[in-house]
UniProtKB/Swiss-Prot annotation:
Pfam assignment, any one: 7tm_1
Residues that carry a glycan: 4, 15
Annotated GO CC locations: ciliary membrane; cilium; endocytic vesicle membrane; recycling endosome
Gene Ontology terms, MF aspect: G protein-coupled receptor activity
Location(s), subcellular: Cell projection, Cilium membrane; Cell membrane
Keywords, sorted A to Z: Cell membrane, Cell projection, Cilium, Developmental protein, Disulfide bond, G-protein coupled receptor, Glycoprotein, Membrane, Receptor, Transducer, Transmembrane, Transmembrane helix
Protein name: G-protein coupled receptor 161
Residue ranges, Extracellular side: 1-30, 86-101, 165-190, 291-306
Gene Ontology process terms (BP): adenylate cyclase-activating G protein-coupled receptor signaling pathway; G protein-coupled receptor signaling pathway; negative regulation of smoothened signaling pathway involved in dorsal/ventral neural tube patterning
Membrane-spanning segments: 31-51, 65-85, 102-123, 144-164, 191-211, 270-290, 307-327
Family per similarity comment: Belongs to the G-protein coupled receptor 1 family.
Designated gene of the protein: GPR161
Protein function: Key negative regulator of Shh signaling, which promotes the processing of GLI3 into GLI3R during neural tube development. Recruited by TULP3 and the IFT-A complex to primary cilia and acts as a regulator of the PKA-dependent basal repression machinery in Shh signaling by increasing cAMP levels, leading to promote the PKA-dependent processing of GLI3 into GLI3R and repress the Shh signaling. In presence of SHH, it is removed from primary cilia and is internalized into recycling endosomes, preventing its activity and allowing activation of the Shh signaling. Its ligand is unknown.
Keyword Transmembrane helix (UniProt): yes
Organism: Homo sapiens
Amino acid sequence: MSLNSSLSCRKELSNLTEEEGGEGGVIITQFIAIIVITIFVCLGNLVIVVTLYKKSYLLTLSNKFVFSLTLSNFLLSVLVLPFVVTSSIRREWIFGVVWCNFSALLYLLISSASMLTLGVIAIDRYYAVLYPMVYPMKITGNRAVMALVYIWLHSLIGCLPPLFGWSSVEFDEFKWMCVAAWHREPGYTAFWQIWCALFPFLVMLVCYGFIFRVARVKARKVHCGTVVIVEEDAQRTGRKNSSTSTSSSGSRRNAFQGVVYSANQCKALITILVVLGAFMVTWGPYMVVIASEALWGKSSVSPSLETWATWLSFASAVCHPLIYGLWNKTVRKELLGMCFGDRYYREPFVQRQRTSRLFSISNRITDLGLSPHLTALMAGGQPLGHSSSTGDTGFSCSQDSGTDMMLLEDYTSDDNPPSHCTCPPKRRSSVTFEDEVEQIKEAAKNSILHVKAEVHKSLDSYAASLAKAIEAEAKINLFGEEALPGVLVTARTVPGGGFGGRRGSRTLVSQRLQLQSIEEGDVLAAEQR
C-alpha cells in the first residue's frame, strides 16, 4: 500500500510540474508577443510622426489626419501598452484603482478616435476624387481642425459612460488590462460598437465604394488584364467602331489590337481591400468577442480567443503607419533620406513645394477626370509641361499619393512616360467617336494653355528688360555714366577733354538707344541702328 501511494504521489507531482512548466511557457510566449507588438506600435508611429513634423511640406490637410492617427497610436504605446506587458506576466493589476479607470478610458478613447479618423480619411479621399473642383473649398484648414476636434469629442462621449455608472471598469485577466465590463451592460456594449466602430466602418464602405466605381468608369474596363479592344475596318464604317470582348486565344491579328492591362483599377482595388481588410481583421474579432460576452456571458468566449482578439486590436496600431504613412512614396523617401542621408534620392525643396501644392487637392488619390494642366491651374500652380506625371498610357502618377492609386484619365499623350512613374508599356486602343471629340476639345484646351504660358513668358522677359533699362537710366541720372556696370571708362584723359575709352562711350550710346527703343516698344529697330 505504501509503495502504491508513493508512486501515485510522484505521478501527481510530475503532472503538476508539467502543467506549471506548460503554463510558464505560454506566459513567456505571450509576454514576448506583447512586447514585440508594443515595440512595433511605438517605433512605427513615432517615425511617421517625426517625419511629418520635420518635413512641413508633407503636412497637408490630408496628412494632418494621418498625423493625428499616428500620434494617438503612439500615445497608446506609451500610456497603455507598458501596463499591459506588466499585467501579462503577473496576471493581476498592481497599479491601483485610479490608474485602472484612467487606462481603460485611454484605451477606449484612443481606439475610438483611431477608428473615427479612418472614416474621416475616407471622406477626404471621397471629396478629392469625386469632387476635385470643389475640394479646396470643402476641405479647408479650419474644417480639418474642426473635424479633428469632433473626432475626439465624439470618442469621449462614447467612452465616459462607464465612469458614471453605465457599465463599469474592471481588470480582465485574459485581456491583461482594465476595460469596460462588456458582459455587465449589453446596452452600453451595443452603443459603443455602433457609435465608435460601426459608424466609421459604414462610412469607409460607402466612400471607398464610390471611389472604386469612379475608378472603373474612368478606366472603362470590366476586369483587370482580361479585356481587349476589337477594332473593325475603318474604311468600311467611315469611323472607328469599337467593342469589348474577353481574351481567349489572341490569334486574330487584324481584329485584336492587344490586351489592355488595367493596372490602375487593380491598384485601386488592392488599396481599398487593404484598407478595409486591415480594419476588419484587426477589429472584427474583438467586436465579435465583446458582443458574445454581452449576449451570452463572459464564459461564452474561450480565454485564448479573448487574448488573440485583444492582440489583434493592438495590432491595428501597427497597420496604420504602414498603410497611411510608409505606403506614401514621398513620406517613405523623406524617411529614408533622414535615416541614411544622401544615399537615397530626395527631391529639391522647390520641386517638393510645387508637388505638394499641385497635389494637395488629392493627397491620397490622384485626380481622375482632369488633365495635369487643369489640375495645376486648379491648385494654383503653373501649367505642367513635359515633366507632367501623366504618361502615354494616360495614367496619373503622383509621388504625393499616400496609397499610390494610379487612375486612368480620359486621354492619351504622345510624350514618353517620366522616369519616376512605373506605368504599363504603351499599347494602342480604339476609341469611340464621342471620345475623339472629347480628346479634340482637351487638346484645344491644352494648346490654349501652352500659348498663354508662352505669352506670359514673353511678357515677363519684356518686363525684366524694361526694369533693367529703367534702373540703368536712373543710375546714369544720379551717379553719372561711370555707375553703369560693364562700362569701360578709363581714368586718363586725352587731348580735347574726352575720355580715352571708346568702348565705354559706344556702350553708353547703345544702351541709351536700347532704352529709348524699349520705351517705344521697338527693340529690333534699336539693334539695327
